Amino acid sequence: MESESVPTVPQTTRPGPRCYNCGENGHQARECTKGSICYNCNQTGHKASECTEPQQEKTCYACGTAGHLVRDCPSSPNPRQGAECYKCGRVGHIARDCRTNGQQSGGRFGGHRSNMNCYACGSYGHQARDCTMGVKCYSCGKIGHRSFECQQASDGQLCYKCNQPGHIAVNCTSPVIEA
């Protein structure tokens, strides 16, 4: 009996997250101790949206060529190419780019769009980012405002930050409770 050898995949270690602020590995931009660096002029102290220098043509992160962004790169595979749309169920685009109007079945829920629950209005059949109804208050259940804007009594609310009733986390003045 001949034994088959199973090919092994070499393990690579990743250096951790890459900071979009300074470009170094090991931390994220929100944890960066260096000043923000402008994407346009590479100077510190301001963002590209606030830059007074003429806008520079940037190179694509995928291929290094100027004139297009990574999402439009002809050299790299389109990450949305295999994406399945939650609205129409077709492959090749995502819901926010969908040109289909109407309530067709499909998507990753096996053809049952009604299983999707909208966090904004509480209805089924769409996601919050596609909601046309408006926001829903988690405190009183009414549509048109969010819980931190609710005018009704907040006795039943429980703060996620301090676990005390009467307010919600956005209005909490207590320090965070460590678990």
From Swiss-Prot:
Mod. after translation: Phosphorylated.
Chain coiled-coil ranges: none
Q: What does the record list as GO biological process?
A: positive regulation of cytoplasmic translation
What InterPro entries does the entry give?
Answer: Znf_CCHC (IPR001878), Znf_CCHC_sf (IPR036875)
> What are the protein's GO molecular function terms?
DNA binding; mRNA binding; single-stranded RNA binding; translation activator activity; translation regulator activity; zinc ion binding
The cross-references to PROSITE patterns, in alphabetical order and at most eight, read:
ZF_CCHC (PS50158)
Zn finger (CCHC-type) start-end: 17-34, 36-53, 58-75, 83-100, 116-133, 135-152, 157-174
Per its UniProt entry, which superkingdom is the organism in?
Eukaryota
Keyword field: DNA-binding, Metal-binding, Nucleus, Phosphoprotein, Repeat, Zinc, Zinc-finger
The terms describing its cellular component in GO are: cytoplasm; cytosol; nucleolus
Q: Where in the cell is it found?
A: Nucleus
Family from the record: To human CNBP and to retroviral nucleic acid binding proteins (NBP).
Function noted in UniProt: Acts in the sexual differentiation pathway. Is required for efficient conjugation. Double-stranded DNA-binding protein.
Task: Show the PANTHER family listed in the entry.
Answer: DNA-BINDING PROTEIN (PTHR47103:SF8)
The name on file for this protein is Cellular nucleic acid-binding protein homolog
